[in-house]
Every structure is written in structure tokens, then in C-alpha cells.
Amino acid sequence: MRMEEIPVPEVGPLDVLVLVMAAGVNFNGVWAARGKPVSTLKMHPEQDIHIRGSDASGIVWKVGSAVKRWKVGDEVVLHCNQSCGECPSCNGEDPLACGYQKIWGYETNWGSFAQFCVAQSQQLLPKPKHLSWEAAASYGLTFFTAYRMLLGRANMQPGDNVLV
């Protein structure tokens, strides 16, 4: 891992550019550094960079031409799940079941460990006002891990009891 200056990424029609105020740390960064279980650079060779980081909080800096929900200046939290946006799962069912699904900042070139990050607009959530930038950047990936375990592997249903 090294620090280097690169151009600010361009946004596509459904993308958002975010000024990163805080970035969360998780085990994806360790895997990326070790190249195990997969090499992040070999996984997506379309660009000669890999910016780690799968969680962030920040301020919307620029929006793509088709983005409707977000505007410049919005305070947001970014979660890690990228999806196709076109399949039935993405359009009303469960985006976490999308067959295209990728973990942003691990299975993609761009992540949160940069001054600016580019993400799909559907990855953004409003930043809770009562949370600091750091606290807001810390829960995205862990939330989706728990969600997938409870609703996927454990097959939890409405009305089931859980211990938190």
C-alpha cells in the first residue's frame, strides 16, 4: 500500500463523487494487501490501480446525469454493495441477491481510502445527524454482513426470535 496522487475519478450517469470525511477499516483491506483469497489487481485489470476501503462517510461533490435522489452538499454514508441496478433483485426485491453484486473497494478499482471516491448512487444513505463522520463510516460493511447471514444462511423470517 502506498500513497500516490491520481486524477479525481469521473462519474457515470448513475454515479456519485463523494468528498471522503472518514473511511472505515475492515478485513477486506487485509485480504487486498495479502492478495488472498484473491488478487485485487488481477480481479479487475481494467485499470492499473486499486483503492481499498469499503465503508465511508462524506459530502456529495458531484452527481451523474441520471442521479435523482442526491444533490451536491448532501451528507452521506456509503455502503459496500454494488449491484447491476437492472435485475428483479435490484428493482424491488433484494439488491443483496443481485448476481452481479460486488464489494466496493475490494472487488472494484475504486474504494474509500482516497480524498474523493466514486460510487453507485444506490450505495448512498443519508448520514445520521447525531453520528460523527467516523462513527457513520464504521457500520456499512458490518451491517450487510449481518443482514446476509440472518436472511441468507440462517433464513430468518418475520416473527423469528433473535438474540442481539
Regions found by a protein language model. Name each.
Residues 1-7:
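Short glycine/threonine/proline-enriched tight-turn/helix- or strand-capping micro-motif at secondary-structure
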Residues 2, 26, 59, 163:
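Conserved Rossmann-like nucleotide-binding pocket used by diverse enzymes
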Residues 7-25, 37-91, 123, 128-131:
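Glycine-rich beta-strand-centered segment in the early N-terminal region that forms part
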Residues 19, 31, 43-46, 54, ...:
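NAD(P)H dinucleotide-binding glycine-rich loop of Rossmann-like/cofactor-binding domains
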Residues 28-34:
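Cytochrome P450 core scaffold surrounding the K-helix E-X-X-R motif
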